[in-house]
A protein has these predicted regions:
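Local sequence-structure signature of Cys/Sec-based thiol-disulfide redox active-site neighborhoods
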Residues: 1-33
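Short beta->alpha junction loops/turns
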Residues: 10, 35-36, 59-60
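Amphipathic alpha-helical interface surfaces
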Residues: 13, 17, 39, 63-70
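Non-catalytic, surface beta->alpha helical segment in thiol-disulfide oxidoreductase systems
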Residues: 55-82
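Thioredoxin-like thiol-disulfide oxidoreductase module
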Residues: 31-49, 77
Length: 82
């Protein structure tokens, strides 16, 4: 399943979530879309405006704490096999 992370470059919460995605080896499973540029219309279509926000194909999860819990529960997809 491919997830979509809507983020803002200058937003500290978004930056921490992007870093966490990479640290957990989840980047191959999560597409990053900037909510101020390429992801703006899609985020609005999904009924969102706040970031960070994670779309799982059914639901928009909003906020650093909630997204952090989701990320922690996902299995890693790391190139190094760890």
């Amino acid at each position: 399943m491919l997830l979509t992370l809507f983020h803002r470059i200058a937003e500290p919460e978004s930056a921490r979530i992007r870093l966490r995605v990479v640290e957990l080896g989840l980047k191959p499973r999560i597409d990053f879309l900037n909510a101020e540029t390429d992801g703006k219309d899609e985020l609005a279509r999904l009924g969102g405006s706040l970031t960070p926000a994670l779309w799982d194909g059914r639901m928009l999860i909003v906020g650093e704490p909630a997204i952090g819990r989701i990320l922690a529960a996902l299995p890693a997809d790391r190139e190094d096999g760890r």
